[in-house]
């Protein structure tokens, strides 16, 4: 689970340093020292520099001619990435020290940490990770030097790495995989760890760098877990053991990160799904296929019903499409050319057989649909269309099926069966910009209604190896999306090559309560599907024209959105979404009947309310319903019954005693009807107490 990078106190995570000059024949480190910049010990210590071409360089780098460089501090994204990469090398050295038979895979920095893959005889245990951390701390304390060395040839590299089969494979790598830090530069290089006193080589690794100067410049790190992983992420390859860790510019930053990890674990929707009886993943059904329990079903229904209402108000028309279709549809759309790996295998049906079992008439391949868009194209094409009907906005809660590898399936956020709140808008080119503007506003407003308000945008452009249509069409679509994104006043971040095969997209990136970023809504502009499906409308001048198609999923999928909201609210859903909105808790059994009357009054207003009639003591009932995240707990004892009142109890342990029944009912109904996303507390709920 990803948690946000935390800048050191006083730092914003950016690099405020001004460029400095490195004279020819001088190390970057010397220039840093001459400029009076910190080299170690501080969160803003300089770890590498960026040259005029944007390439990161070690501090030992010596330019042939005078060069202008930008110092990169430890508390920047690039600085942390270098520290983590160097820490991954220290991990690999520790593994080969303690497990000499271990073979090295790859060890890149990743968001908030790093990993390294190893071929070992047995999986790593928690005790192994402790021993490795201890050895790593020794290596850091030794202050080993990172020394860059250029191989004279690939043959020399293969010879030196003969006992490292995975590294030998990388010598000839041309994949451009960003996780492969070993190769990819202009030269084939190794980084040796040197004894700081004797400068003897202690250990080394095939690597393009850059690295920090010495292991002593690794301020704080921790190993977090281990798991199995296929070599290069391909399940056809060998299964290796992967160790994950994290490293930061200071102990304080590491401690903050660990606290966030622990809080993320407490909020894990998979854990809360069990504790709150929301959903499950039965083995009998299969990996990545969720079933929603009654309480989860209520939350899901509320999410969908509110979305339906807002789509109706925005002029969408509701459609439905089947779950399977003939293969030809996905040949037409291009999915079988460009997306087959993400689809389940075909089912051959409708074959006819002779009495002897031989095939008289071959069947046809049918596929579970991975997307709804081809079927919506057929709905548009089902009859003649006029410009007067455009924009035509089609909407469906359509369940699709995608073959996700078992290693990436994760709770509700990465599943194999998912229900998309899928819309496809068909419009004229003249309507395109206005439609995109209003669509983006609609998306942001609806997400805000669910309590998600911290956004930025990402513009995904053409993958040059995986697209349909002409370069000119892609360029026009990309420019239009960029223009609309820029007008939104939100940050627009480029994502080169990240588009689907049929068109560029803007995705809305949302930050949750922990500051983690989730890709949420996508808006995709498509000139290609209308061409492939022969979609036309009659224009005002009587000519036949192609519509523009806009693909849009607001939640991404209901399942994923459900999981994200569960973690955002730590299971304490806003009262309007909560499966149980209020619960009556009697002080004693003789108060049950009175609370039943209160509950009946709330139910008449549509409130989901229960009365706890269990044999548990009142204190235990309060603990139980607090843990179940019920927004409103209503207590009643003798004084409450006599006064026709209740006492409010909230999850933060605040309490309002002696609230007249009518006032209590009105306060709850008002809170829910206003769709308040805040958790109700004694301070927030405005109600007059009778005491």
From Swiss-Prot:
Family indicated by similarity: Belongs to the class-II aminoacyl-tRNA synthetase family.
Among InterPro entries, the record links this protein to:
aa-tRNA-synt_IIb, aa-tRNA-synth_II, aa-tRNA-synth_II/BPL/LPL, Anticodon-bd, Anticodon-bd_dom_sf, TGS, Thr-tRNA-ligase_IIa, Thr/Ala-tRNA-synth_IIc_edit
Q: Which positions are annotated as binding Zn(2+)?
A: 373, 424, 551
Region ranges (Disordered): 1-22
Q: How does it assemble?
A: Homodimer.
PANTHER family per UniProt? THREONINE--TRNA LIGASE, CHLOROPLASTIC_MITOCHONDRIAL 2, THREONINE-TRNA LIGASE
Cofactor(s), by name = Zn(2+)
Residue ranges constituting the TGS domain according to the UniProt record: 1-73
Q: Where in the cell is it found?
A: Cytoplasm
* Gene Ontology annotations of biological process type: threonyl-tRNA aminoacylation
Species of origin reads Mycobacterium ulcerans (strain Agy99)
Keywords, A to Z? Aminoacyl-tRNA synthetase, ATP-binding, Cytoplasm, Ligase, Metal-binding, Nucleotide-binding, Protein biosynthesis, RNA-binding, tRNA-binding, Zinc
Cofactor note from UniProt? Binds 1 zinc ion per subunit.
Which GO cellular component term is one of those annotated? cytoplasm
HAMAP family for the chain:
Thr_tRNA_synth (MF_00184)
What is the stated purpose of this protein? Catalyzes the attachment of threonine to tRNA(Thr) in a two-step reaction: L-threonine is first activated by ATP to form Thr-AMP and then transferred to the acceptor end of tRNA(Thr). Also edits incorrectly charged L-seryl-tRNA(Thr).
Positions of the region Catalytic?
268-574
Q: What is its main location?
A: cytoplasm
Q: Which named protein is this? A: Threonine--tRNA ligase
Gene3D superfamilies noted in UniProt: 3.30.54.20, Anticodon-binding domain, Bira Bifunctional Protein, Domain 2, Threonyl-trna Synthetase, Chain A, domain 2
Q: Which CDD domains match?
A: ThrRS_anticodon, ThrRS_core
- UniProt superkingdom: Bacteria
The catalytic activity, as recorded, is: tRNA(Thr) + L-threonine + ATP = L-threonyl-tRNA(Thr) + AMP + diphosphate + H(+)
Q: Which GO terms describe its molecular function?
A: ATP binding; metal ion binding; threonine-tRNA ligase activity; tRNA binding
């Amino acid at each position: 689970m990803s948690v946000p990078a935390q800048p050191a106190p006083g730092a914003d995570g950016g690099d405020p340093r001004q460029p400095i000059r490195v004279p020819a024949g001088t190390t970057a480190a010397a220039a840093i020292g001459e400029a009076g910049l910190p080299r170690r010990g501080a969160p803003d210590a300089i770890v590498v520099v960026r040259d005029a071409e944007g390439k990161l360089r070690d501090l030992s780098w010596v330019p042939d001619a005078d060069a202008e460089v930008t110092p990169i501090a430890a508390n920047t994204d690039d600085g942390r990435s270098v520290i983590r990469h160097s820490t991954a090398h220290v991990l690999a050295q520790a593994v080969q020290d303690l497990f000499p038979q271990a073979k090295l895979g790859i060890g890149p920095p990743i968001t908030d940490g790093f990993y390294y893959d190893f071929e070992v005889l047995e999986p790593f245990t928690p005790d192994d990770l402790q021993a490795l951390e201890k050895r790593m701390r020794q290596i850091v304390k030794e202050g080993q030097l990172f020394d860059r060395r250029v191989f004279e040839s690939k043959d020399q590299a293969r010879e030196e790495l003969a006992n490292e089969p995975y590294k030998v494979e990388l010598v000839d790598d041309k994949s451009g995989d960003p996780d492969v830090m070993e190769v990819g530069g202009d030269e084939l290089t190794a980084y040796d760890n040197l004894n700081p006193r004797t400068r003897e080589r202690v250990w080394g690794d095939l690597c393009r760098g850059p690295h920090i100067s010495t292991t002593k410049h690794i301020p704080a790190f921790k190993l977090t877990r281990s798991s199995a992983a296929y070599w290069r992420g391909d399940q056809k390859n060998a299964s290796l053991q992967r160790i994950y860790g994290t490293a930061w510019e200071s102990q304080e930053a590491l401690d903050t990160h660990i606290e966030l990890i622990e809080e993320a674990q407490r909020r894990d929707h998979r854990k809360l799904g069990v504790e709150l009886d929301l959903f499950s993943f039965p083995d009998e059904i299969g990996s990545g296929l969720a079933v929603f329990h009654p309480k989860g079903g209520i939350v899901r229904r509320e999410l969908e019903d509110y979305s339906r209402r807002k789509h109706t108000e925005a002029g969408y028309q509701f459609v439905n499409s089947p779950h399977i279709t003939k293969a030809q549809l996905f040949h037409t759309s291009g999915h079988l050319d460009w997306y087959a790996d993400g689809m389940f295998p075909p089912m051959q049906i409708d074959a006819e057989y002779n009495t002897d079992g031989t095939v008289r008439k071959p069947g046809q391949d049918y596929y579970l649909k991975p997307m709804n868009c081809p079927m919506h194209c057929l709905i548009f094409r089902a009859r003649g269309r006029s410009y007067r009907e455009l924009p035509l906005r089609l909407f469906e809660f359509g369940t699709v099926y995608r073959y996700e590898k078992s290693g990436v399936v994760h709770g509700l956020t990465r599943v194999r069966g998912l229900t998309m709140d899928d819309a496809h808008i068909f419009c004229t080119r003249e309507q395109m910009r206005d439609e995109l503007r209003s669509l983006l506003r609609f998306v942001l407003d609806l997400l805000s209604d669910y309590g998600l308000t911290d956004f930025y945008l990402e513009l995904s452009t053409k993958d040059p190896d995986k697209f349909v249509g002409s370069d000119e069409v892609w360029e026009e679509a990309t420019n239009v999306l960029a223009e609309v994104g820029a007008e939104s006043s939100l940050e627009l971040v480029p994502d080169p090559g990240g588009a689907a095969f049929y068109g560029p997209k803007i995705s809305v990136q949302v930050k949750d309560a922990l500051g983690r970023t989730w890709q949420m809504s996508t808006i995709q502009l498509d000139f290609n599907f209308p061409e492939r499906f022969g979609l036309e409308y009659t224009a005002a001048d009587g000519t036949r024209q192609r519509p523009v198609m806009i693909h849009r999923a607001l939640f991404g999928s209901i399942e994923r959105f459900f999981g994200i909201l569960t973690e955002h609210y730590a299971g304490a859903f806003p009262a309007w979404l909560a499966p149980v909105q209020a619960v009556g808790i009697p002080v004693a059994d003789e108060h049950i009947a009175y609370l039943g009357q209160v509950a009946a009054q709330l139910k008449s207003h549509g409130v989901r309310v229960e009365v706890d009639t269990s044999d548990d003591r009142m204190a235990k009932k309060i603990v139980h319903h607090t843990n179940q995240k019920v927004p409103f707990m209503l207590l009643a004892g003798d004084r409450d019954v006599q006064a026709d009142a209740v006492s409010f109890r909230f999850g933060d342990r605040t309490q309002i005693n002696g609230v007249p029944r009518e006032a209590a009912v009105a306060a709850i109904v008002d809170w829910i009807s206003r769709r308040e996303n805040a958790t109700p507390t004694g301070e927030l709920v405005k109600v007059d107490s009778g005491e």
